[in-house]
């Protein structure tokens, strides 16, 4: 690659007509990161010897789980070999988006920074529910959609069938669907030429006050928060004072630049360009995704549209297995929060589990990733309590409370309880349709509609309570459909429901870690299941231990752990029956006394086992 060509993508203040901002919308495992690797490789911004798989996924966990958690971006030079712009030196800015349902807000901000999107679908699997949801987001924002089938080198690929499916969804001709292989690089140059031709160039007012959209922010140990922005109007220069419009805080710009493929310092950014700012801020919550950056002096008065605070949808308690790890857990969560503004937490005390934190997450994947990172990056051993959602409870006297934790459930009579609802989309092969519908109905789902995407794939839409799907819904769905179903959900208001709190009592004492808020119809099932499970997990004591499930003061299920008995008659060889009776009576008295004063200690392993499988049938 010539030196002249090598430099031009690193220089900023490019005319908007030469810029193309685009992203790749794809499901987990459909080859988005591999395609991004090929694009970087072909454009020559990375020397072949420096190339590594999943180049844009920086986090070890991202590479291992094969998912993109944070949005990344890279600026690359490209000279099209075909189409209307043949031979022109264009600048492509690829914004890599997270593909998972929990990170929809991040995806919508990243889409806001683009004018076009490559819809990437695995030629052996077809489109998945989450890709469909992100596609609709992109269509709402009027992005130019370029449909592409990836992995055409696979023996199982069926490009004819899935080209037709994509054409039906987007409303184009099957011939317009491009076919590429991220692995071999086949069709990738043609794809980039198509991007240059079809994606419109950015439009903005270069003379207006600066306005830049934050689409991601990452915490760097040495430089503080690195904020990724897309310039909408005006320009930002190095060493200027800037202002965040949602909070009104002002900062000095210590460094401004572009990513190509590593951070490269520049003099500034102008309309349509994507780059990064470093302001010395130490907390990502001060540099919020979706916020507008402007100049502190003579800045814009109107922020960009669409900013929203990320709202936790699922709550769970995290407790260290050994109490002396509590300070380390606090420090670890605070460090994670530096990089993840949507994670919220507050200290919580449980009688059974000791000190820990009640954490709020965007969804189940977010929760699992956070927990995995805490355990792996910080070496902690954790117990997480069963996930719960936020209920709005109106008591008899009209007071309204929001319950995030079963132990905060108010006692006495309640006027009404409202639970969060979600609109759920499931794409499933027709053969598994019956089992999937049965599962959704058992979880109190109301069917909204059903569409056949192709002859053998169906899209189902349900309105379902969020509390029903956060437990084991996904696992049950996968096992009923042999792993072929895909799922997406988005919040859809709230609805009144007949919910009760089920307490689990050991010897008449409630154990807070096992309490759950369930629908009245499922209360007996949950109570019986937990009682049977705990009977197997808690070791036998010297006295009989009753395990009970209760709603308020009404017992709905009971199991007994039989007492261990010493054979007091072992020494009696023959002799009078009254002697034996006396010994047995004496033992019985002792057991009775023990039962009154004895306490049951539940081993940690029992907590871990009961809570980790709390949602399974």
UniProtKB/Swiss-Prot annotation:
Membrane topology type: Peripheral membrane protein
UniProt subcellular location: Cell membrane
Domain spans labelled tr-type G: 17-203
Pfam families to which the protein is assigned, alphabetical: EFG_C, GTP_EFTU, LepA_C
Superkingdom to which the source organism belongs: Bacteria
CC terms in the record's Gene Ontology section: plasma membrane
GO molecular function: GTP binding; GTPase activity; ribosome binding; translation elongation factor activity
Chain sites annotated for binding GTP: 29-34, 150-153
Enzyme Commission number, as recorded: 3.6.5.n1
Membrane spanning stretches: none
Function: Required for accurate and efficient protein synthesis under certain stress conditions. May act as a fidelity factor of the translation reaction, by catalyzing a one-codon backward translocation of tRNAs on improperly translocated ribosomes. Back-translocation proceeds from a post-translocation (POST) complex to a pre-translocation (PRE) complex, thus giving elongation factor G a second chance to translocate the tRNAs correctly. Binds to ribosomes in a GTP-dependent manner.
Record-given protein name: Elongation factor 4
Species annotation: Corynebacterium urealyticum (strain ATCC 43042 / DSM 7109)
Lineage: Bacteria, Bacillati, Actinomycetota, Actinomycetes, Mycobacteriales
